C-alpha cells in the first residue's frame, strides 16, 4: 500500500471515520486478508471509538484471522479504492451475534481512480450481454473483462453500422451465469480489435468494445464486487496449480 502517492493517505480521525461510515452505509464488501488467507466481510457498525466487522462464513477462517498479527482490508466502490491495516482483531458480539471489534485505523488510503483494474471474465461458461441499438437492432456480445467501473466486450460478428464511441445504452442486460442477470446503464468508450494467434499460426481478429458503467445502484455495485472478488480468487487458484 505504500506505493500510493501520499496525497491519498488520510490521517485525520474525522476523515477516516467519514470514509468508514460511507462503507457501512452502502454495505460495501470488504476483503479481509492476512498472511495465510482471506475472506469477504462487511462493516456492521462504526463510531469514533471502534469498528465492528462481520464474521466470515467459515469458522476456520474466523479462527485464523484472530491469530494473525496484522490484517489488511480492501474495499472498492465505484469512485475509489480504500485500503488500511489493523492490528490483531478481537472477537466480540454485535446484536447478539459474533463479530470482530477493533479500534479505528490510524490512517487509511482513499485512492480515487479514473481506471479500474479489470479481471478477465471466464471463457467457460461465458458471460453474455445484450442491448438495443438506436435503430432497434439487438447487439449481443461476450464479456471479456469486468471491473466496478466498466467492462470489455467481444463481438462474434462485424461491428454494426452506426455504432459509435460515446453512445449510451440503457438497461444493458448482463448474464453472469451462476451469479444471475443484471441490468446496467453504460457508455461505449472505445471500439478496437483483439488479435490472437491460433494453433495454425494465423491471426484471429475480433471486434472489441469498452464500456463505462453509468449510475450503478449500490445493490448492483455490491454484487459486481462479489463477482470480481470471486474471479480474482479463481484466477489465483489456477495460477497456483500451474506453479505446482
Swiss-Prot record:
Task: Please tell me where this protein is predominantly located.
Answer: other
A GO BP entry: bacterial-type flagellum-dependent cell motility
Which Cys residues form disulphide pairs?
A: none
What is seen without this gene? No visible motility phenotype. Disruption of this gene suppresses the reduced motility of a yhjH disruption, thus the double knockout is motile. Overexpression of this gene in a yhjH disruption has the converse effect, i.e. it reduces motility further.
Q: Does the keyword Nucleus apply?
A: no
Record Gene3D superfamilies: Electron Transport, Fmn-binding Protein, Chain A, predicted glycosyltransferase like domains
Segments forming domain PilZ: 112-230
Q: What is the effect of changing residue 223 to W?
A: No localization with flagellar basal body, thus no binding to FliM
The organism's place on the tree of life at top rank? Bacteria
Location in or out of the cell: Bacterial flagellum basal body
Q: Which GO terms describe its molecular function?
A: cyclic-di-GMP binding
Keyword entries, A-Z: Bacterial flagellum, c-di-GMP, Nucleotide-binding
Q: Which InterPro entries match?
A: PilZ_domain, Split_barrel_FMN-bd, T3SS_YcgR, T3SS_YcgR_PilZN
The UniProt entry's GO CC annotations, sorted and at most eight, read:
bacterial-type flagellum basal body
Nucleotide-binding found in the keyword field = yes
Q: Which family does it belong to?
A: Belongs to the YcgR family.
Know anything about its domains from the record?
Answer: The N-terminal domain is involved in FliG binding, the C-terminal domain is involved in FliM binding.
Q: How does it assemble?
A: Monomer. Interacts with the flagellar basal bodies.
What task does this protein carry out?
Answer: Acts as a flagellar brake, regulating swimming and swarming in a bis-(3'-5') cyclic diguanylic acid (c-di-GMP)-dependent manner. Overexpression of this gene decreases swimming and swarming motility; those cells that are motile turn predominantly counterclockwise. Binds 1 c-di-GMP dimer per subunit.
- Specify the protein name: Flagellar brake protein YcgR
Amino acid at each position: 500500500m505504500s506505493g500510493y502517492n501520499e496525497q491519498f493517505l488520510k490521517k485525520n480521525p474525522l476523515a477516516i471515520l467519514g470514509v468508514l461510515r460511507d462503507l457501512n452505509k452502502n454495505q460495501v464488501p470488504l476483503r479481509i486478508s492476512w498472511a495465510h488467507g482471506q475472506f469477504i466481510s462487511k462493516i456492521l457498525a462504526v463510531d469514533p471509538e471502534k469498528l465492528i466487522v462481520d464474521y466470515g462464513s467459515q469458522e476456520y477462517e474466523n479462527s485464523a484471522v484472530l491469530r494473525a498479527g496484522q490484517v489488511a482490508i480492501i474495499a472498492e466502490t465505484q469512485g475509489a479504492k480504500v485500503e488500511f491495516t489493523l492490528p490483531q482483531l478481537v472477537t466480540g458480539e454485535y446484536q447478539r451475534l459474533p463479530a470482530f471489534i477493533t479500534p479505528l485505523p490510524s490512517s487509511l488510503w482513499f485512492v480515487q481512480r479514473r481506471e479500474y483494474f479489470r479481471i478477465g471474465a471466464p471463457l467457460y461458461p461465458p458471460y453474455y450481454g445484450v442491448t438495443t441499438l438506436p435503430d432497434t437492432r439487438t447487439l449481443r456480445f461476450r464479456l471479456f473483462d469486468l471491473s466496478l467501473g466498466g467492462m470489455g466486450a467481444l463481438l462474434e460478428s462485424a461491428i454494426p453500422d452506426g455504432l459509435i464511441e460515446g453512445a449510451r445504452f440503457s438497461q444493458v442486460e448482463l448474464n453472469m451465469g451462476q451469479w444471475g442477470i443484471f441490468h446496467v446503464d453504460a457508455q461505449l468508450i472505445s471500439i478496437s480489435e483483439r488479435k490472437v494467434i491460433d494453433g495454425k499460426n494465423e491471426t484471429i481478429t475480433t471486434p472489441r468494445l469498452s464500456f463505462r458503467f453509468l449510475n450503478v445502484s449500490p445493490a448492483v455495485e455490491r454484487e459486481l464486487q462479489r463477482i470480481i472478488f470471486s474471479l480474482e480468487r479463481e484466477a489465483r487458484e489456477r495460477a497456483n496449480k500451474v506453479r505446482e
